[in-house]
Amino acid sequence: MAPKKEEKPASQAAEAPEVKAEAKPKAVKAPKKKEKKAPAKKVAKEPSAGGEDGDKKSKKKAKVAKSETYKLYIYKVLKQVHPDTGISSKAMSIMNSFINDIFEKVATEASKLSRYNKKPTVTSREIQTAVRLVLPGELAKHAVSEGTKAVTKFTSA
């Protein structure tokens, strides 16, 4: 854009040297105005820096959300069954891993069943069949009855 400004003063016959002299201070003034705006932007960045702290907090929240565990639920069930019994952190970690493994096995089996039946959706029927295949004997029966009870409660609510 600077060459265009120089072309305009060149088209004006005698005033060209004076305009160039004026153009230079204008060019100097424009960056000064931009410099004044730059600190204002820095001031605007400082509150967003606080927002970045907020972003860091939300990043921490996102990290917490990624590590979903069943620890709270394991503890609640433990207190229902044995109210005076505690559990160590290592045992809690083992139980959490156990639940994740069982969940993965049931989900994988249900996915296979839906593929065998050429259905795109995993329904409660596939889950129920997968539980019967993955869990042994009496445990499968109890899991199916509890699952059926939970689905009935969910659909009625």
Curated annotation (Swiss-Prot):
Signal peptide residue numbers: none
Q: Which UniProt keywords apply?
A: Chromosome, DNA-binding, Isopeptide bond, Nucleosome core, Nucleus, Ubl conjugation
Post-translationally, this protein is described as follows, namely: Monoubiquitinated to form H2BK143ub1; may give a specific tag for epigenetic transcriptional activation.
From the UniProt record, list the coiled-coil ranges: none
Q: Where are the transmembrane segments?
A: none
- Mark out the compositionally biased spans (Basic residues): 26-42
Query: For this UniProt entry, what's an example GO CC term?
Result: nucleus
The subcellular location is: Nucleus; Chromosome
Note the InterPro entries from the entry.
Answer: Histone-fold, Histone_H2A/H2B/H3, Histone_H2B, HISTONE_H2B_site
According to the UniProt entry, the cross-link of type Glycyl lysine isopeptide (Lys-Gly) (interchain with G-Cter in ubiquitin) is at: 153
- CDD domains reported for this sequence: HFD_H2B
One GO MF term:
DNA binding
Region (Disordered) residue ranges read: 1-64
> What SUPFAM superfamilies does the annotation carry?
Histone-fold
Q: Which Gene3D superfamilies match?
A: Histone, subunit A
Q: Which family does it belong to?
A: Belongs to the histone H2B family.
The record's annotation in PANTHER family points to: HISTONE H2B (PTHR23428)
Annotated function: Core component of nucleosome. Nucleosomes wrap and compact DNA into chromatin, limiting DNA accessibility to the cellular machineries which require DNA as a template. Histones thereby play a central role in transcription regulation, DNA repair, DNA replication and chromosomal stability. DNA accessibility is regulated via a complex set of post-translational modifications of histones, also called histone code, and nucleosome remodeling.
The record's note on quaternary structure and interaction partners says: The nucleosome is a histone octamer containing two molecules each of H2A, H2B, H3 and H4 assembled in one H3-H4 heterotetramer and two H2A-H2B heterodimers. The octamer wraps approximately 147 bp of DNA.
Q: Protein name, please?
A: Histone H2B.3
Source organism of the structure:
Volvox carteri (Green alga)
